[in-house]
């Protein structure tokens, strides 16, 4: 037994905590106590128990402090201490030493807050008194002077328990305390106990009342927070809907380059007036009624996913393992949200990143560390601290660029890009590493400058952390100036605004011809300077225009991204001189006329690809004058400078692969009929199967509306089949007459009958044969038959074979032949 105990102490029992360590030592101490309590036990067994119990208590304490530090408070069930106390009491009678162990346990908060510990201490004292004294009204007699002030030892234990303010069940201790004083103590002690209990009950009642009030206040605060969030969400939804209506236009109207549209103003940063209008009373009523429903929906929604703290790494899996097998393996340890598999470089094993629903499920799954998965011994480790939030990198960055940035030896497990459906200007990603050391090393790139103007941000991912938006627009440092004269450029605008603050950047909007649109965005150094610019320049006359200056408002709903290229060649002519108005008008009309030939839709683009990457894909095939990305529809509209370039680009881009998706080229109106694919990054949600192709879907894909299916259309077709013995005119054995007449066109040619075209033959136009013609044909056939018979007889005579027996002449009567021809037609 001792050898087994030593082998157990040398193993990693504390891998999953101290539970296994305490269980092992409790079993060992129980064995020592039973050996010592045996009536026939030797002195060696008793000495072994004395030393073994003390050594076990010290070993558990040292082991726990080494594992958890000062936070270790011992076994909540104090199993080793109880074995030690009963050993001292029953075997040695060392009551004072046993009480010292009880007092040490009472000093630990973990046990001092538990009423069951104090009841166990009380029962030990009562059993001890009953065993030491057989008679007497009171188990602890005392002088009369001490009866009114000093309670007995068991009562003092209960009184000491009632002094703990965080006792989990004080009512139970009060009940036993009053019962003990009523049964064993004097009247003075009982009266003092009742007074003490009365005061204590008042304190407990007030404490419970304060706790209830605090809970009620907390619940009301949460309700107000939910209500404010619901109001903000409804207001944001209304604003997004208004912006979406203004941004969404007729796709066909988008092809007219000469017409200004509101959604172009939104894409360039301008805020339409309708977005700043107050909602109507009906909208306010709807939004006011929304919080209750939103609050209920938020309560019913599951908790937010926390991939960073609910995932584990499972390594050394078989190379042919599947997601289903891994999910079945961990199913009994918790709910699995998602599983990602990646083959090792050697190709002999696979590593999996398993995401659970809660942190407790992930901790439970660690039990499988070192266990078998088939014939492989797997390793299960925590995946905390391996995911980094990376942002502010160049817009053209992709997976390959990130691998080069962090280095090939960075041990990257996967990269997760956000969806651009509702904000096409997002530029961040999540990078997961194989271990925490690699992630910590990658954070050293935080603050690195890329391409001379992008300051990289690399931080640990924390779903609970919220960061205020940065930038001139979100910080209130950007002003929007409208109605600027056409002859003003960016330098003149900067000189105008610099009188009221420090200008950081000026962005003047241009049209397709490169001319000013009379609108600009100016970034200043502080918010106060921006407000001063608005106060000083708003409604000021500049040249012949009245300026309109206001603070820029960022649009939260950005379902598309737009880029244009200034066509300088079309805007100027005659060696750099500006073209006359007549030339500009003719060029504009020509451009609008062939716009549909220069534009096309590129479909099948993933919703994680931004507009810069689409441009880098399409720009090698020619100069792009306009590009607009629609992540919600999974495509983009590309406009080239001429028809030839657009045609070559369509041939080159069709069937191109982009991140595992096959791109295809189609007309622009088809883009707005497409929907971007739904990404499901969970294994606990069944993926939708694509519908089977039917007649309705086929007609819909061809751009035609399918006719609605009605009940008569579902009936089987009625087929007429010929039946022997049916009624009708009996014809002869020859050819039957054609009942259906052939309809002819105006030029005399036959038309289609029953859907099949009837071809004109010589029999259609040839005259009909008479009886004389049939008679001549018959006689000609008979003469040819007689000549053949003579030739066969001559051959048989030459070969010596017997001649064939001639049959009697059965020449038909000519008159009968004529009758048959007239009646039967042959």
UniProtKB/Swiss-Prot annotation:
Entry-linked Pfam families: RRM_1 (PF00076), RRM_occluded (PF16842)
Key words, A-Z: mRNA processing, mRNA splicing, Nucleus, Repeat, RNA-binding
Listed Gene3D superfamilies: 3.30.70.330
Localization of this protein: Nucleus
PROSITE patterns: RRM (PS50102)
Xref: InterPro entries: Nucleotide-bd_a/b_plait_sf (IPR012677), Prp24_RRM1 (IPR034397), Prp24_RRM2 (IPR034398), RBD_domain_sf (IPR035979), RRM_dom (IPR000504), RRM_dom_euk (IPR003954), RRM_occluded (IPR031766)
Family matches, as SUPFAM superfamilies: RNA-binding domain, RBD
Record-annotated RRM domain positions: 310-385, 386-463, 477-554, 598-670
MF annotations from Gene Ontology: RNA binding
Function summary: Functions as a recycling factor of the spliceosome, a machinery that forms on each precursor-messenger RNA (pre-mRNA) and catalyzes the removal of introns. Chaperones the re-annealing of U4 and U6 snRNAs (small nuclear RNAs) released from previous rounds of splicing, an initial step in reforming the U4/U6-U5 tri-snRNP (small nuclear ribonucleoprotein) that can reassemble into another spliceosome complex; this step involves binding U6 and facilitating the unwinding of the U6 internal stem loop, followed by base-pairing of U6 to U4.
Record PANTHER family: EUKARYOTIC TRANSLATION INITIATION FACTOR 3 SUBUNIT G
Protein name: U4/U6 snRNA-associated-splicing factor PRP24
Name of the gene this protein is made from: PRP24
